[in-house]
Amino acid sequence: MFEALKSRLTTPRRASRSRNDVLAECSDLARLDRLRRHARDRDTRQRADARYRALLVGGDASLRLEDRVAAVQVCTDDAVLAYVARSAREEIVRRAALDRLDSDRVLMEVALNDPIARLRRRAVAMMNDPELLQNVLHRGHPDDPRIARDAGRRLRELQV
């Protein structure tokens, strides 16, 4: 009996929560960003990336809106910015991501699909690829004819 007690005291206790549980509850964007980029374990990187993205788009109420916008404003990962521009709940977060994007393809997706007209029009105004602008011009937005007009205007601006 003494040996059993001694071994329980000298062997390290297993953490009551797994690393996955800790990541799933983590709300520290800086820590998650470091983990998703630098963790040795691929599974940890993937889980940290998923949690980071979920927090940025508003999938968890544990973060203030201002903190999410600030994190987007310093984000340098184009894939994350594209995801946030397409998926964030709040217009201000999508706009912060949109302002940092360099991808005309993502801008086109926003121009054609975002529920907020201001963001659709802003995306068109930021586009520089004539072929993709032509696509927006022809497809337009079913509820907003201004998108096609804006695309035509932007095409003319680029031709000058």
Predicted regions and their residues:
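Alpha-helical scaffold segments
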Residues: 1-160
